[in-house]
Structure formats: structure tokens, C-alpha cells
Amino acid sequence: ALVERVANIAERLEIKRRILDLDSSGGHVEDAMKAGDAIGASHWMLRVRDDAICHSACVLILAAGDDRLITGKVGIHRMIRIGSEATTRAELNQELREVYAKMKDYLERNGASVAVADLMMTVPNRKLRLLTEDELQEYGLDGTNAVQDDLERIRLTRECGEDFVRRKDDFDRAYERSCAKVEPGQGQEAAYECGLALRAGFGFPDETCPKDSPLSEYQDAAAPDPIQAGTQ
């Protein structure tokens, strides 16, 4: 509910650059998916900082961000309904099959791999499996959201032209290679400053589409403090 309220407030205040810091041990799976859909519909960058965690149901919210920046710990395990009325393994299995079917549909529409849900099933609820950097990339939980990236490419090609999209792709690769990974304690602003220095070499800001040029929101103003939130 908190994340949904934050998303609604950002819409009402017309906040264009939206950064949400996640730091949560989890919560209810259905609530997390509902909150994630609200995040996905309102265009947020989600961060898990080096001193933060995103465990259990929090991972579902992480999947929904337009972009994800992770330096903290992301962990998964089996998710159960705390209010479950199951009394046998068969009843619990049927209940979990329904939950995980919804979860897989949710992950798929948010550009994350459904393999995340399968992996969750193998980790007992009382334990936790931390995901490596490679796994976060493989499962579509870190960096740019694949589905949102497709939508953005379609829009930019329509409004700014194919050359703009090609140059932006080249810039994005250079940014990932040179600037994206932030050392603990360095601060995300260092990555943005690095990216701003790269832009001119790729013809940005673009005269036709200056507002859609990479990091345009950071050009003239310092970044505001991000909103802090968890999934509890």
C-alpha cells in the first residue's frame, strides 16, 4: 500500500524523475505484485543500495522498475500465504501452484525471467538464497527493464527518428561500460557526472529531442533525495 501511495503522489505532483530506494525483508506476495504493477505503470528507477536489502516479496517490486541499480543484497525463498488454511501437503501445493502461476505471469509482463519463480520454489521459506550479479542480470532483475525498453524504443523511433535511437544505444553501451557500476560509498551522482561527460561524443543533447536525450533530467539540476520505501 505504501508503494502505491508513493506512485500516486508522484503522478499528482507530476514528478518526472522518480527514484525509489528499496530496503525491505519482504511482505505479502499479492501485495508486492499489486505494488509492482503500480510502479511499472508510473515509471520508476529502483535502487538497492550497498547498505540495503531486497528479500522475498521485495524482489517482485524490484522486477517492475523501468531501471534497476543494485549494489545491496537481493535474496529469494519460497513464498507462503501467512493466512493459509492448508492442512495437508496437497492443499498447500495446490495453493502455491495458484500463487506461482500468478507470479510467473507477473514476472513475464514485467520483463523478468519466470525462472526466478522456479528457483524460489527450491529454497525453504526459513532460508534465503542471495542472487549473484550474474544471476540478477540473467533473470532480468538488474539494469534496464526489457519490456519498458521495447516500449521506449518504439516511442523514440516514432518521435525522434532511427538515428537518435542508434546514437542512444551507442551511448547506453558506453555508459554501462564506463559509468554505471558505482563503487560502495561513491554515490550515484558520480555515475551521472560520468555519463554527462560522455554525451557530447554521441551528439547529445539532441536538438530535435533534447528532453529525451540521455540524462537530460540531470543536466540543469542536482538530483533530489530519493524516496525511501519498503514492501512491508
Show the residue positions of the predicted features.
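Solvent-exposed, polar/charged alpha-helical surfaces in well-ordered, non-transmembrane soluble domains
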Residues: 4-11, 33, 37, 60, ...
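Small-residue-centered hinge/linker elements
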Residues: 1-16, 22-29, 71-115, 119-121, ...
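N-terminal secretory signal peptides
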Residues: 1-22, 26-43, 113, 129-134, ...
